[in-house]
Every structure is written in C-alpha cells, then in structure tokens.
C-alpha cells in the first residue's frame, strides 16, 4: 500500500496525528542506520517540554543530518506560522554555541508549498549550522525509501 502526501495531510487533521507523527518520524529516522543517540517522545509524551526530537548521527543520510539535529514537528494547519514560532522560540532558547553545531529540522504533516523559501530565508540568517524543512510530500518520499516498516501495516497509519 502506497501512502501519499495527500493521505498524510488528511491524517494530519485528526487528533491522533499529533501523538503519532513523532512516532512515524522516529521510526523512519531509526532506519538510517547511523544514529548513535535518539530521543523522540511520542503519544502522550508529546506534551512534555523540550524538543520534539533530538538525534545524533555519525554519518547522516538524505533525511537525517550528520551530527546533532534538533527536530520540531507539527500537524498545525498553517505550517509557515508554526515554523516561524518554533524557529523563534528555539533560536532564542538555544545557546549560540549549540546552534552553530546543530541542524534544526522542521517537519509538518501538511503540504507546505513555501518550505524551501522559508528554509532559505532562515539559512541566510546564519543562526544554525544548517536547517531542513520537511512536509507531507517529503514524508511520502521518505516512506518510499524504507523497505519494511511494520507500523505501516497497522491501522494507525491507514489511508484517509
């Protein structure tokens, strides 16, 4: 069964997506094979303070940056507004010395037509080592690269 960006965006409208998106991204990230540390609360733990996810990867790949990356995830309807809010909050709360060696990754389960322009605008500020922005289309592509993920067979990620 192919899960499309349209399916993911529809799923983002459901309350369950808020707690399940981190689980999806965590499981996808774990497939990279280069992760040495991973903290990605999911389910009821999404309400805990702190980053939505933190990863340390020895080599990185197309989806998981090499080195330290800090992740913010969202199912909110306006990805740009949420990304700006997360960017400002995390830039203000994270010491510059940490930001200089950390990639900020913003993920939305919505389609986000302005994600590349947003990313380029934020990269130009030179406040983080690097910045990545992923949307439902990227999640679809990432899912396609993964051979076997048993959780895709569960009802949690059924087509909508």
Label every PLM stretch briefly.
Residues 1-160:
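Mixed-charge (Asp/Glu-Lys/Arg
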């Amino acid at each position: 069964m192919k899960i499309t960006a349209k399916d993911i965006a529809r799923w983002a409208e459901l309350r369950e997506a808020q707690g399940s998106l981190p689980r999806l991204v965590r499981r996808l990230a774990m497939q990279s094979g280069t992760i040495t540390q991973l903290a990605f609360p999911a389910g009821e733990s999404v309400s805990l303070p702190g980053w939505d996810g933190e990863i340390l990867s020895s080599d990185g790949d197309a989806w998981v940056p090499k080195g330290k990356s800090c992740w913010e995830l969202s199912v909110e309807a306006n990805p740009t507004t949420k990304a700006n809010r997360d960017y400002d909050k995390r830039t203000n709360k994270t010491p510059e010395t940490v930001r200089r060696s950390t990639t900020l990754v913003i993920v939305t389960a919505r389609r986000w037509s302005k994600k590349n322009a947003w990313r380029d605008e934020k990269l130009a500020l030179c406040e983080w080592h690097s910045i990545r922005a992923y949307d439902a289309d990227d999640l679809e592509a990432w899912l396609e690269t993964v051979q076997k993920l048993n959780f895709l067979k569960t009802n949690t990620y059924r087509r909508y």
